Design a protein with these regions (language model features):
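Cytosolic catalytic domains that perform sulfur/thiol-centered chemistry
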Residues: 1-275
Length: 275
């Protein structure tokens, strides 16, 4: 079953009481931009989730630029918006950045035990292009939900687990950043350029088409090739955000067992002994 929902399908169900839509628009270079765009116009009834405030935890000396939120914090955020674990609410995530931030929410929900989640194919752009209704009105809260975050530790790895796994037979370590960052030719964000030794480069943007929709499963299989057949797949990026697009891509071809190195390169390069 696909992890995506089309704009047409969402238009038919987004007002149902067991469906909640989450606007995840964000810009790393301008953290206020996504929320500003949301206030100007969004899918009617959708709530806004901010990458730094809602989809990440507190930063420390290690753990990367966007650590995972704690179960307690994520429970508080999602339950306050009316998300239920029993019976499970259908959560639909969207953005306008090629799945970069919507996929983060998709992955977090699955990591925290909530599988009833979809990502809007094509994002807000596809919704607007289809001529569907938009709104600037705040959504109505139906009341708190009973969502409880229950982590699935098998879905995530840390730096020491990556160090032990990299280079081992049957392991594909995937770097999701653009090629110039992977090759160490440029590094606009983190203090050290380069990549984890043994990693393969599959830039996250290649998972989608120019119109912002995700490539078909057949296209994804062709893109991944032999890497998707390895026993264990570990995916990272700069801070555990855009790697989730590759995890979404892999889930579409049946590899939803792939793991996220949540701290990613920004965590890895905080350990001098690993460089």
């Amino acid at each position: 079953m696909s992890e995506l929902i089309s704009v047409q399908a969402l238009a038919q169900c987004h007002e149902n009481e067991d469906v909640l839509v989450m606007d995840c628009r964000f810009a790393l270079a301008d953290p206020a931009a996504g929320e500003s765009h949301y206030r100007a116009s969004h899918i009617p009834g959708s709530f806004y989730l901010h990458l730094d405030r809602d989809l990440s935890g507190e930063k420390g000396p290690h753990g990367g630029r966007h650590p995972l939120p704690t179960p307690e914090a994520f429970t508080a955020t999602l339950s306050a918006l009316g998300v239920n674990s029993e019976p499970p609410t259908l959560v639909v995530a969207y953005d306008d950045s090629g799945f970069a931030f919507a996929a983060r929410l998709w992955w977090l929900l699955r990591y925290f035990g909530h599988d009833r989640v979809k990502v809007l194919d094509g994002g807000f752009h596809a919704w607007r292009e289809a001529g569907l209704p938009e709104s600037a009105a705040p959504p109505k809260l139906a009341g708190p939900g009973n969502f409880v975050a229950r982590p699935r530790p098998e879905r995530v790895v840390d730096a020491r687990q990556v160090e032990a796994a990299r280079g081992q037979p049957g392991v594909a370590l995937i770097d999701s950043r653009e090629a110039p960052r992977f090759l160490g030719l440029e590094e606009p964000i983190d203090p050290v350029a380069g990549h984890i030794q043994g990693a393969l480069n599959y830039p996250w943007r290649e998972a989608s088409r120019a119109d912002g929709t995700l490539r078909s499963p057949d296209e994804q299989r062709g893109r991944w090739g032999e890497a998707a057949r390895e026993q264990d797949i570990i995916v990272y990026c700069g801070s555990g955000v855009t790697a989730c697009v590759n995890l979404l891509s892999l889930a579409e071809i049946g590899r939803d067992d792939a793991k996220l190195y949540a701290g990613s390169w920004s965590d890895w390069c905080s350990y001098p002994e690993l460089l």
